[in-house]
C-alpha cells in the first residue's frame, strides 16, 4: 500500500518583524484537501509534527466570512471526523523516511515560523530527495524546503522549479507588511526557479519528484498530481 507522510507545522503563531504575534497555524483547506484525496485514493496516511505537538488550524481558515460557509462547514466536519488522528501526530524526529513513498507539507503561516528551520524537517526532506521519493508542498508549505541542507551546507533544491504563495498574494492577504521575510522572494534568493500563476487561482509545478502548489486553491490539483505520480 502506498504510504504518505503529511508533516504539519506545530506553530500556532507567526512572529512578525517587530516581534508582534500573528495567530496562525495550518491552513485547514490545504490539509483537508490533501489528506482527503489521499485517503480516498486508498493510500495510508500518517501525520507528523515537530515534537509530536498537536497542530493548530488557523482560525481564519475556518471562518465562514473568510472562506465561505460551505468550505468552513466541510473543513470542520472533516477535522472533527479525523480528530483522533490529528491530535496524535508522530514525532517528526522519530520518522523513518524509508517507510514512506511521499512527504507532503500543507501551508498556513505555521511553516514560516517553525518548519523552515527545523533540522528534523530538513533530514526528512534530504533523505526523501536522495531516494527520489515524491516531495510535495502547497502555499507556505514550501518554506519547509528551506530546512534542507546537504553535507556541504548547500540547498539541494536550488535550480529546481517550484511555486509557493506569491509575494503578490501575501500583499493582497494583508500579511506582507511587517513580515520578517517573504517566502517567494526567499526561495528565489536561495536559487529556486520560481514560477507563479494568477493570484488565487490553482497553479501546480512539477520538477521531477518535487511537486508544489501556489495557494489554497491549488491543494486538490496538487493532490491529483501526487496521486498520479504514485500510481
Which residues does each predicted region cover?
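Catalytic nucleophile serine of serine hydrolases
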Residues: 139-141
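Conserved, well-structured core segments that form or line functional sites
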Residues: 135-136
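Extended, subdomain-level signal for the structured scaffold at the beginning of enzyme domains
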Residues: 1-131, 143-231
